[in-house]
């Protein structure tokens, strides 16, 4: 055999071996792919879709939800019955083709199975997602329905437990509860018939009505308690108190109290009847008006009770106080009469005492008997309180006025005595001033001093004349005494001033001799001042003239003389 043939055979054998090896490799690779596809199929088949379907089925879906569930359930059945069986057949076919080294057809089958698995995966994901949505939606709807039903049941239980607290509103509350129950039944019917939108609206209304009725029932007991318990109790208390007060001889300015009791009871009954409409705002407002009317009756009774305490106290005090003030007035009249015999008094005191007597007489006539027979009166104590307080106030004013009049007349005799004493003193002082001036040996007395002296003397004479009358005008005495006091004080000051001016002028005239010979101004002022001093007796002008001239030549000289004089000045010895 030639070497060429051998080489050909070897080449063919090698090709066969290589082809076999390639086939084995491709077969193993396909086996691996087929195994992977089988595992994917098993994994998909093992998903808990059936459990999820059963879980959703147990929710007892209705309406559109139930229709949707059936569609997805049928899709799952189709997958398990048809798609998985078809995939299984293709896998089996791919295995046979791969085992017979029909790799091209095997590859085609593998690709087909892979595509089918991809579609199945998507379908299963859609099914599971839809089931989950149905489950969540149903749970949400169920929770909403459960919440609404819980509200209703709690409201029903609350109403049942507190039925006695709702009074006349109970029939209307029962009616509202039945309406809500009807709405729940309507919701179930609509939901079952596949109309979830309208069913949801009905459920919303049922829940809103439940909440609203719950809020109303929370407020009703307080209103009913007022109408059925508080107001009747207060009225009973008022009527009992009213009868007791009448037995204790109380009287009232209001004559319609019994009618007001009846009107309030009618208002309570009317409000209870109107409450069945559940118009709570109106009921509360009417309750407020009823309470205000009850409170006004309490105020009437409390006012009279408080007035009794004050009036009873004042009824005991008034007669004693009246007697005291009347006694004071008699004493004051006697004192004024006694003083009038010696003094001319102001008419004001007499008129005032007469006015006091009139006020006292009016209280004696109008109020004294009422106070003394206080327990037998048939007037409201509040009116008696006002009457007594007005009378006591009048007596207080009278007593205060009496004290003022007494203060005005009690010092009349002292005023006279003091005026006589002052007159004696002032007359003595006038004589001492005259002697004091005479001892000065002045060239003459200034006219202003003479005028003041004789005026003061006249005023003392006027006071003396007034004190010498048979009936003394005490007001005139007081006035003249004050005038005399001022006049004598002014005269004393003027006396000191005249003497000081005269003395200082003499001293300065003598001192000016130092300058007269060589100071023409001093000489001229000396001559002028001397004429004023000796001829005109104007000591103030003379002092001003000479002191001015000396100050021009010797500043401070005047002050030196003035200071020296003030230290040695002789005082009038009274």
Curated annotation (Swiss-Prot):
Any one GO biological process: septin ring assembly
Cytoplasmic side: 27-574
Protein's UniProt keywords contain Cell division: yes
Segments in the Extracellular topological domain: 1-7
Gene Ontology CC terms, in alphabetical order: plasma membrane; septin ring
Source taxon at top rank: Bacteria
Function: Negative regulator of FtsZ ring formation; modulates the frequency and position of FtsZ ring formation. Inhibits FtsZ ring formation at polar sites. Interacts either with FtsZ or with one of its binding partners to promote depolymerization.
Membership in a protein family: Belongs to the EzrA family.
Primary localization class, coarse: membrane
Pfam families per record: EzrA (PF06160)
Keyword annotations: Cell cycle, Cell division, Cell membrane, Coiled coil, Membrane, Septation, Transmembrane, Transmembrane helix
Stretches that traverse the bilayer: 8-26
Coiled coil (UniProt feature): 102-141, 274-350, 459-520
Subcellular location: Cell membrane
Protein name as catalogued: Septation ring formation regulator EzrA
InterPro entries: EzrA
Keyword Transcription: no
């Amino acid at each position: 055999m030639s070497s060429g043939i051998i080489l050909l055979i070897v080449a063919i054998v090698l090709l066969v071996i290589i082809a076999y090896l390639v086939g084995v490799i491709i077969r193993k690779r396909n086996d691996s792919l087929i195994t992977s596809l089988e595992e994917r199929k098993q994994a998909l088949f093992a998903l808990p879709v059936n459990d999820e379907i059963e879980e959703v089925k147990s929710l007892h879906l209705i309406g559109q939800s139930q229709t949707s569930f059936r569609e997805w359930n049928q899709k799952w059945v189709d997958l398990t019955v048809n798609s998985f069986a078809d995939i299984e057949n293709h896998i089996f076919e791919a295995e046979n083709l791969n085992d017979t080294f029909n790799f091209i057809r095997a590859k085609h089958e593998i690709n087909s199975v892979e595509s089918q698995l991809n579609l199945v995966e998507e379908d299963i994901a859609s099914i599971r997602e839809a089931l989950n949505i149905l489950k969540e939606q149903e749970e949400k709807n169920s929770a909403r329905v459960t919440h609404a039903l819980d509200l209703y049941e709690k409201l029903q239980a609350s109403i049942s437990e507190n039925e006695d607290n709702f009074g006349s509103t109970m029939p209307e509350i029962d009616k509202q509860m039945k309406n809500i129950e009807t709405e729940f039944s309507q919701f179930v019917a609509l939901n079952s018939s596949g109309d979830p939108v309208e069913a949801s609206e009905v459920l919303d209304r049922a829940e809103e009505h439940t909440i609203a009725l719950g809020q109303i029932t929370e407020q009703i007991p307080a209103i009913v308690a007022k109408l059925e318990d508080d107001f009747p109790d207060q009225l009973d208390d008022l009527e009992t108190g009213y009868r007791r007060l009448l037995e204790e001889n109380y009287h009232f300015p209001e004559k319609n109290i019994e009618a007001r009791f009846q009107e309030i009871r009618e208002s309570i009954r009317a409000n209870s009847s109107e409450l069945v409409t559940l118009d709570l705002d109106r009921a509360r407002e009417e309750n407020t008006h009823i309470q205000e009317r009850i409170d006004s009756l309490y105020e009437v009774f409390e006012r009279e009770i408080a007035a009794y305490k004050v009036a009873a106290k004042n009824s005991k005090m008034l007669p004693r106080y009246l007697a005291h003030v009347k006694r004071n007035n008699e004493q004051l009249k006697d004192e004024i009469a006694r003083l009038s015999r010696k003094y001319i008094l102001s008419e004001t005191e007499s008129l005032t005492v007469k006015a006091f007597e009139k006020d006292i007489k009016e209280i004696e006539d109008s109020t004294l008997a009422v106070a003394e027979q206080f327990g037998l009166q048939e007037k409201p104590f509040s009116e008696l309180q006002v009457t007594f307080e007005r009378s006591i106030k009048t007596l207080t004013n009278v007593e205060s006025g009496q004290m003022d009049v007494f203060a005005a007349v009690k010092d009349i005799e002292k005023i006279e005595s003091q005026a006589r004493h002052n007159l004696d003193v002032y007359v003595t002082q006038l004589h001492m001033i005259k002697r004091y001036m005479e001892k000065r040996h002045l060239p003459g007395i200034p006219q202003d001093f003479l005028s003041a002296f004789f005026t003061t003397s006249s005023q003392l004479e006027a006071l003396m004349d007034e004190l010498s009358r048979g009936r003394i005008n005490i007001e005139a005495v007081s006035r003249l005494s004050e005038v005399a006091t001022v006049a004598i004080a002014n005269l004393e000051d003027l006396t000191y001033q005249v003497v000081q001016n005269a003395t200082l002028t003499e001293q300065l005239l003598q001192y000016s001799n130092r300058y007269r010979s060589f100071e023409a101004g001093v000489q001229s002022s000396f001559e002028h001042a001397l004429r004023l001093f000796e001829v005109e007796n104007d000591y103030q002008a003379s002092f001003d003239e000479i002191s001015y001239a000396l100050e021009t030549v010797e500043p401070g000289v005047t002050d030196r003389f003035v200071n020296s004089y003030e230290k040695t000045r002789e005082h009038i010895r009274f």
